[in-house]
Amino acid sequence: KKDEEHSLYIRPFIFASGECIKASASDEYTFMIITSPTTRYYPSDINVLVEQHYTRAAKGGVGYTKASGNYASSFYPTKLANARGFTQVIWTDAVEHKYIEESGTMNIWIRINDTLITPELNDSILGGFTRDSLITLARENGIKVEERKISVDEIIEAYNNGILKEVFGTGTAVTVAPIHSITVGDKKIEIESQINSYASKLKKTLQGIQNGSIKDVYGWTSKVNSVVSSH
């Protein structure tokens, strides 16, 4: 049965498994794949806090990789944000805490007027596959997309001028997830839902390609045939 909010999550991973304990690279690694049925990642409204003190990843590090160590630095500040009622945090750059980078599980998208803006990739931002897919889908649907730095101040200014239309996140698990509010310090920015939002339009197209109801002209999907074990 096709269900747009349910899927099988597939996660390949690799870990050091050498028979030694020392502060050095291992000479042996184990590769595994785990799967899990999943449903909507965030079941309720997403309200985020812009983090301007703690840092997820710094320039020159490995923030652009899917490394487990990158999550460790995010746990404590995220726990503090959760205790205040926030769903997630939006990380800012490690130097000035001025430019937004990503959220805990998502790449971030800002719609100002009719332009979609997503932070340009650097060595502290993980470049997600869903992010790449949405850039392609948005541009093919005539939506202007900019990959560039975007500051917290620019978002606040757009909100004050009434031209901040949407904020949403993208990721393998979340797909496309609208963000309902952003808090910067003591200022809360509430984003009104759009009837024909870019987020809902792009999510519908992406999920249609994933479940086969929309033809995949990009070669993003592969058919997996049933395998019957002989044992």
Feature-to-residue mapping (PLM):
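Short, glycine/charge-rich beta-strand/loop segments that flank catalytic centers
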Residues: 2-19
